[in-house]
Amino acid sequence: MIEEIRSLVDEKVNELDGVVGLRQTDQGVAPYLFQKGDDITKLVLEPRYPMAQVTSQLQKRFREADFGVVARGCDTRALFEMTKRLQIYPDKLFIIGISCTAEQAEICYCADPVPNIEDWPRSEVLGDPVPGAQPNPLVFEHENLSWDERWKFWQQQFVKCIKCYGCRDICPVCFCEACALEDPMWVEPGLLAPDFPTFHLIQAMHMTTRRIACRQ
């Protein structure tokens, strides 16, 4: 499938101002704006990366530009959520949707590995659709716990937190310029591990209406 995707990207860079995708370099893999004349063979699909964030930043900086983006199902869900919040301009974005394989869906426990972008102004989906994976068995185990057992479970999980902000930084639908998790009124600076459950509930409640099942 990678060659089919590269072929479409190669076509679109001649029509658009650029296509956002992942590029392989000697230093590793990172998001990149492929443009006319670039080596499209450097385009790769792994590892997963929150492409909606990168796309939003590009669109804000170059408001009149017409971009494309290579996006998985979770990326497209993020793009829709960002659009609702005026962080993505759909009229200036062509989506190249990628259907994940069954193996990829199982790794992420993804229930919807196929991009659902029929309502997007301009898009094309590549790859064979596969059924969604079963939920993580831990979900069923957690549902059978009492409230006290659930509280104890989360205490044990969050005591591992070192306040690295990785949960925030990897979130595909985080776009706030001022983060509540860095506000000393709510989160004491320098305190490790951060207060339970204040730090973690702020993050959870702040994102609760934007969840896209990214499994990050």
Residue ranges of predicted features:
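Ferredoxin-type iron-sulfur electron-transfer modules in oxidoreductases and energy-metabolism complexes
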Residues: 138-158, 176-216
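Iron-sulfur-associated redox domains of electron-transfer enzymes in respiratory
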Residues: 1-160, 168-177
